[in-house]
Regions:
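Short, glycine/charged-enriched secondary-structure capping and boundary segments
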Residues: 19-22, 49-51, 72-73
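Short alpha-helical
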Residues: 13-14, 41, 73
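Non-catalytic, surface beta->alpha helical segment in thiol-disulfide oxidoreductase systems
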Residues: 59-89
């Protein structure tokens, strides 16, 4: 069985610095010190289909290969994937 880990990415609107959050709320400043980014990617987001911020990365843990296979999806595609609907790459 594959384990789903959702990682949301947000970037500074001024300098474009990208940060990722996984499960825990994180407070972080971009290197340019021009924007403070707050947020978290909790499992509840997946259950409620309440996914904010794009793009997002869905990590699928592949037990057979003992590695991590990942694919980048737009937020709408993640929701479609979770519902079992067709999506665009």
């Amino acid at each position: 069985m594959r384990k789903i880990i959702l990682v949301t990415t947000t970037n500074c609107p001024r300098c474009g610095y990208i940060r990722r959050t996984v499960f825990e709320p994180v407070k972080e400043k971009c290197p340019e010190q021009c924007y403070t980014v707050n947020g978290s990617a909790a499992p509840e987001f997946v259950k409620r289909y309440d996914i904010k911020g794009a793009p997002s990365i869905l990590f699928l843990e592949d037990d057979e290969r003992a590695g991590i296979a990942y694919k980048t999806f737009e937020v709408d595609n993640i929701i479609k994937w979770l519902k079992g609907e067709k999506y665009h790459d």
